Amino acid sequence: LARITSYTTIQAVYIEQPFLFFKSGGSSAATMAVLQKFNGVVSWVCYNLFDIEPQYLRAQEARKLCGIKVPRGQKAKKVVMDFILDNVPDFDVVYTRQGNPRPGYADRADSYVVAKAGLTRENQETKDSN
């Protein structure tokens, strides 16, 4: 992240807001606690590096800002990955022998969606203030 500041000016930081509730088939309390800690560290690092208070987007809000609709009964991760593969030409995915994306690629796709949603929100706010 520090290297980025050498060639560009960061004006906003958007981070995916972690889940705040349990749902059937979701992450365990331990996993959610680790994600909360990780988000806290990332928020702190971004604030210290860029002197910008991060803004948080729920995953559903980020998908909506990007125009991604998850039909009832479908897995959001798959819908997001399909959207990214269809719309981001330089997004490459490595697959397992079973044809699933290797671990980490769904997270990369989610990160792209949050970043794109943040940019969309910034552009909307700029347009609204003019």
Indicate where each model-derived feature is located.
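Phosphate- and other anionic-substrate recognition elements at nucleic-acid/protein interfaces
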Residues: L1-N130
